[in-house]
Amino acid sequence: MKPSLHVGNTADVHMLVTEDMCPAFDGIVVHQVYSTWSMAHHMELAARKVLAPHLEEHEEGIGGHLSVDHLAPAAVGATVRIHAEAIELNGDQLTCEVTAWEGATLLGRGQQVQRVLPKEVLKRIIDRAARRSDEKGRDGT
């Protein structure tokens, strides 16, 4: 990681809640609100934006942990801001506190951890996972 990455670095992601961000099970939308999984995705994205500018050319980040407490709903059409802040750097790990806001209303909070690896190490890990999948067959048997 570049020395420019510090505790306190931040990034924000802004989005308009759309119907494709609503919770749906078996293709049926159950609520016209921002889903927990959409919030989790946007929290990952904001945390990635904290890390990405500070990666060396030979490095890549990989997610290791995400916790989300979904505290309040946001309706379709609402503007949501996800804020990520680096709160801990420990060797090759970055921990971000992530929060989701609609105006002054706290919608959610959590933590996201990314590990920074050399790209060739990550490629070996992914290749090993692909081989496991090929050995089992794509249907998991």
Model-derived features with residue positions:
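HotDog/MaoC-like acyl-thioester-processing domains
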Residues: 75-76, 86-141
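Catalytic strand-loop segment that frames the active site of acyl-thioester-processing enzymes
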Residues: 1-35
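A generic structural signal for short beta-strands and their flanking turns/coil linkers
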Residues: 9-13, 39, 62-66, 76-82, ...
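Hydrophobic beta-strand-centered segment that forms part of the acyl-chain substrate-binding groove
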Residues: 47-81
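Generic structural detector for well-ordered beta-strands
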Residues: 12-18, 69, 111-115
